[in-house]
């Protein structure tokens, strides 16, 4: 029997869902979601926002974690076997409030419909300004791991967005479209365009982390990526089929076995 191993996540449901395909000897020790690395460009600046309407503990935790910059101070100090980092939530962009504070434009925060947010400056993912903030924040995150002696446990996940559906799921997808229209040709065409545009924007972010910061990276080829029409979180270009998560886990296993690769 293998010794118990632990993983900490800085990223999205993509990494979180992939951990379900790890062996039973793995435990999820930490999950820092909805927290753009771009906000790490500025130190902790708690904005004066009314968060009382956040209904779930998860919503409260991720929004407060974003404001507190929890990923940069908790993960470098956490005794885990691997820190898995994905950049999916960078797509959300960030908001600069009137006082200069940076917060991630998460669905939880936007859903509060606060006047401080509606009048704030939005810094969109993919713009030069967002990328410049990301470079500073990502560098701080990696530096914190390096200073704690845990940077070799950091692995970046590079898995492209997709609108491709596996052969076994295509008939099911047609049935779902006939039932409720959620997977209509128009919807799937939009997903394909969004996936292509977003993947192009992500390339310089991935290159910076992999090449400039020297972080070990798992790349999942597009031919191994497919979405799941019946994914528990719904139809989206980053809600993958089981085979994609298995490919992620295989890459993670190789990266752990050879941390210098």
Model-derived segments and spans:
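Short catalytic/ligand-binding loop motif for oxyanion handling, primarily in non-cytosolic enzymes
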Residues: 15-19, 40, 91-96, 162-168, ...
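Surface-exposed cleft-lining segments at the edges of enzyme active sites
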Residues: 110-141, 187-196, 236
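Hydrophobic, aromatic-enriched interface-forming segments
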Residues: 120-178
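Acidic carboxylate-rich catalytic motifs and surrounding loops in phosphoryl-/glycosyl-chemistry enzymes
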Residues: 156-160, 214-231
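Substrate-gating cap/lid alpha-helix
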Residues: 166-219
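Histidine-centered active-site loop/cap adjacent to the catalytic His
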Residues: 232-261
